Amino acid sequence: MKCLLVIDMQEDYLGNSRDVKRYPYKSKELIHSINNKILEYPNESIIYIVNRFFWEIGRKPKKLVDGLSVISNNVFEKRMPSCFSNKKLLEHLQKIDASELELVGVDGNYCVGASAIDGINNQYKILFNASLVGVGDYNKFIRTKKKLEKMGVVFTS
């Protein structure tokens, strides 16, 4: 099964009250484009990932960004850059017989990039949809992209 992993599309990275210097993404465009991609997948194959650092455990749960189409209950939390650090996500992917994963979200240099690497290491075919991945530092992303391509990540747009 082919799945769409929507990574870190949450209020603190893309919402109106975010630190824009730290998270300079074109939020509205990215949300709109990802919503269009979500429409291409059956509900059960859409998986949302939220990032919650260990020091945030006592706080409110992370909220997906307003405006993002949330059409499945497949929401997994992670505490490390790679979404594959969540064992429940790995179990879910095995249960639904996932073999190909399209990654979208933020940031291409960090969590989406780390998830792409771990996805390859976990024997998944990884599609990195560059037009649907927010990147804060494009100069760094040139190096990140080369590394990912070398590992076998397939870039699409």
Q: What does each model-identified segment do?
A:
Residues M1-V75, L90-E91, K95-I96, V154:
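Active-site acidic carboxylates
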Residues H32-L39, Y110-N121:
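Histidine-anchored nucleotide/phosphate-binding helix
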Residues L68-F76, G136-S157:
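Structural recognition of alpha->loop->beta junctions
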Residues N73-C83, S131-L132:
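A short, structured active-site edge motif that brings together acidic residues
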Residues A98, V104-N109:
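Active-site neighborhoods of divalent-metal-dependent phosphate/nucleic-acid chemistry enzymes
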Residues A98, Y124-K125, V153:
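Short phosphate-binding/catalytic loops that engage adenosine nucleotides
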